[in-house]
């Protein structure tokens, strides 16, 4: 790598390569410095809109020769500053690489470009009898979901991105293009490079193609909602449902604070208490059996008002409330900013971790609703702060640190599905110890000049 060239020189070269699909317009740059996270705007120097893998490879080579950082960008829905251009550089926006390349219906897999969103993918799959179930809530891009090892509401039944990504096409820091695997459902051939790039947040290479498992659309779907007097009762119900081998598709927890926000935001009348939202997939008979079994377990744990939602309209209304928890939470404190964080613990420790975290937030005076994918021990907290009060930001940071320390002490993780990004760098060594040095060795081997999404996962001295 030579010395970093000026932005104007590189912009001219990129314009010569891809024309107006290279932009230095201030509005475009600012748009790509933002995300759903609470971090300040960190825009790139240039934004490019590639259309093919070859274009990505050519631009990566040009960036490498110019010493210019490379930052992949999907839908801008990340929550830990994962796509922030902390060192400037060139942002690769994949909005034009948003196609389904191949659908293998018999094999139940698809090959897609990274810019397609999960909703776009499922719209393309309509009519095939297949669907892609990973649902992080936001309409995230498949490339972004892959890069952050995303999860979501149906992970308890269908797994996370690491379970559903079969193979990748990746452009490395030197412009080489590799395929990490074939389409076979299993392989013992060499290192598992696919898993290595899933969750790497663009720090090892740029993903240009993703092969995904897809699943049969269930014959029948039913949903249900049930409230509880305590978080413990709600979590114990969820654990009992899982341990009873009921193949629940979703089991989501909203605490009393979040239910208050949901009612106000969506004009609903739910009981403002810890509440479980369920969804069941299968045949008509099996769905009815699953729901009845879950209802009996909820009753054993003092559940209130177990209500079914069988009609599509009723299910949509129920899950619309769950999917809008960010905006419902923000409505609890108008004008506030949400510091969103997540942890994941073994489900046997979930009730303890949730209860202690709820108590911690309350004792420190924070409005901080909680929502969790309790089937796999993952929960999120939205810490609402006044952006004009630095002491609140510091308090939120301390609250998050205690939440993470609590999870790690319970043999959990500092992030269940948001990734490390900028926000969790300080906790990675606490969780993984000397394994972080191995990660750094891999990073150095694949990206010796440190140009691939710098400042993410590992500290670079630049902080938001």
What are these regions (language model features)?
Residues 1-464:
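Noncatalytic alpha-helical scaffold of FAD-dependent oxidoreductases
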């Amino acid at each position: 790598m030579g010395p970093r060239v000026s932005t104007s020189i590189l912009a001219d070269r990129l314009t010569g390569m891809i024309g107006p699909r290279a932009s230095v317009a201030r509005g475009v740059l600012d748009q790509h410095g933002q995300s759903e996270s609470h971090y300040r705007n960190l825009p790139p120097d240039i934004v490019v809109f590639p259309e093919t893998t070859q274009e990505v490879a050519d631009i990566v080579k040009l960036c490498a020769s110019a010493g210019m950082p490379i930052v992949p960008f999907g839908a801008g829905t990340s929550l830990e500053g994962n796509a922030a251009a902390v060192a400037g550089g060139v942002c690769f926006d994949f909005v034009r690489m948003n196609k389904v390349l191949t659908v293998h219906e018999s094999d139940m897999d698809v090959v897609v470009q990274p810019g397609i969103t999960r909703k776009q993918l499922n719209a393309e799959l309509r009519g095939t009898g297949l669907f892609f179930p990973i649902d992080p809530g936001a309409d995230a891009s498949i490339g972004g979901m892959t890069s952050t090892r995303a999860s979501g509401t149906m992970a308890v039944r269908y797994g996370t991105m690491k379970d559903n990504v079969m193979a990748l096409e990746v452009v490395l820091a030197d412009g080489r293009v590799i395929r990490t695997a074939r389409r076979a459902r299993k392989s013992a051939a060499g290192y598992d490079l696919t898993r290595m790039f899933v969750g790497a947040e663009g720090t090892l290479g740029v993903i240009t193609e993703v092969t995904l498992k897809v699943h049969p659309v269930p014959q029948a779907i039913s949903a249900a909602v049930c409230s509880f007097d305590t978080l413990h009762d709600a979590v114990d119900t969820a654990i009992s449902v899982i341990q009873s081998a009921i193949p629940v598709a979703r089991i989501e927890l909203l605490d009393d604070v979040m239910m208050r926000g949901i009612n106000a935001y969506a004009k609903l009348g739910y009981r403002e208490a810890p509440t479980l939202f369920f969804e069941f997939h299968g045949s008509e008979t099996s769905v009815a059996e699953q729901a009845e079994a879950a209802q009996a377990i909820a009753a054993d744990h003092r559940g209130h008002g177990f209500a079914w939602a069988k009609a599509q309209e009723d299910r949509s209304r129920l899950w619309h409330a769950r999917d809008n928890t960010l905006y419902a939470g923000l409505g609890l404190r108008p004008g506030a900013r949400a510091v969103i964080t997540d942890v994941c613990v073994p489900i046997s420790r979930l009730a303890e971790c949730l209860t202690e975290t709820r108590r911690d937030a309350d004792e420190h005076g924070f409005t901080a609703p909680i929502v969790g994918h309790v089937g796999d021990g993952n929960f999120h907290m939205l810490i609402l702060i006044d952006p004009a009060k630095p002491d609140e930001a510091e308090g939120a940071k301390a609250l998050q640190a205690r939440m993470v320390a609590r999870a790690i002490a319970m043999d959990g993780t500092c992030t269940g599905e948001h990734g490390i990004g900028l926000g969790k760098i300080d906790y990675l060594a606490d969780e993984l110890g000397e394994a972080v040095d191995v990660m750094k060795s891999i990073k150095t081997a694949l990206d010796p000049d440190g140009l691939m999404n710098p400042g993410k996962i590992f500290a670079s001295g630049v902080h938001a």
